[in-house]
């Protein structure tokens, strides 16, 4: 835990603070001790780490982007259409429960990555170029800088306060109804509700529009796949 958060008799920064304004990548997420993963909750929520010692309290900045990867089960083949999973249902459940619901709640995008077959790997077809993606992202970031120019400490949609979410994530009737249905069916928390709106706002920015639509909400909810089936 000290390596991740920081600590010691003379407290120093841990990995989360060293990743401040950058990316912290954790591979094989369930292989970390659950107690180690749980300490990520405070910095993910507050953007800082506070370490208390007898001599006093030290606070380190920790505004980082968490990127994590994991297998669907211990053998890695659960859900694979070509290879049989060797894990029993209790084994899969135990493996996945190493990641708590509250931590999962703080991760905005859940993406399931299917196996890429040989045909796709060897294909000569070229996808969207990184330069085009970068241009779109820079345009979206420019929209956000302009949007939050009068709000100190807020530079991106992810940092929006509840008041800013209400102001900049207004929904029409169709989008609101879709979000309400998802909240009920997936038993989502208030935190997940706000994070869905932030992601939807970003999707709209990437599309170059100020108006949030039902499609933006639908896509943002689609990125909460682990909320829907993680504990099934």
What are these regions (language model features)?
Residues 1-3, 86-87:
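Short, flexible loop segments at the rims of nucleotide/cofactor-binding pockets, characterized by
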Residues 21, 27-29, 39:
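Walker B catalytic acidic pair
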Residues 10-11, 34-231:
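Basic, amphipathic alpha-helical bundle interface domains used for macromolecular binding and assembly
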Residues 17, 31-32:
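Extended, folded domain segments that form the structural surfaces/walls around functional sites
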Residues 2-24, 57:
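Conserved alpha-helical scaffold flanking the Walker A/P-loop in AAA+ ATPase domains
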């Amino acid at each position: 835990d000290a390596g991740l958060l920081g600590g010691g008799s003379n407290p120093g920064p841990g990995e989360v603070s060293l990743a401040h304004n950058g990316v912290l990548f954790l591979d094989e997420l369930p292989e970390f001790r659950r107690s180690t993963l749980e300490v990520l909750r405070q910095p993910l929520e507050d953007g800082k780490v506070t370490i208390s010692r007898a001599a006093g309290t030290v606070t380190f900045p920790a505004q980082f982007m968490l990127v994590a990867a994991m297998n669907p089960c211990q053998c890695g083949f659960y859900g694979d259409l070509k290879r049989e999973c060797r894990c029993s249902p209790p084994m899969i459940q135990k493996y996945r429960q190493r990641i708590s619901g509250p931590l999962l709640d703080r991760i905005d995008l859940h993406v399931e990555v299917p196996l890429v077959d040989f045909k796709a790997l060897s294909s000569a077809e070229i996808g969207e170029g990184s330069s085009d993606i970068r241009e779109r992202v820079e345009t979206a970031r420019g929209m956000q800088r302009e949007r939050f120019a009068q709000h100190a400490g807020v530079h991106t949609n992810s940092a929006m306060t509840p008041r800013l979410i209400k102001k900049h994530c207004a929904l029409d009737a169709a989008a609101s109804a879709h979000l309400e249905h998802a909240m009920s069916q997936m038993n989502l928390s208030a935190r997940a509700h706000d994070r869905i709106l932030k992601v939807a706002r970003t999707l709209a920015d990437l599309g170059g529009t100020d108006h949030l639509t039902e499609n933006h909400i639908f896509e943002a909810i689609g990125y909460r796949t682990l909320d829907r089936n993680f504990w099934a």
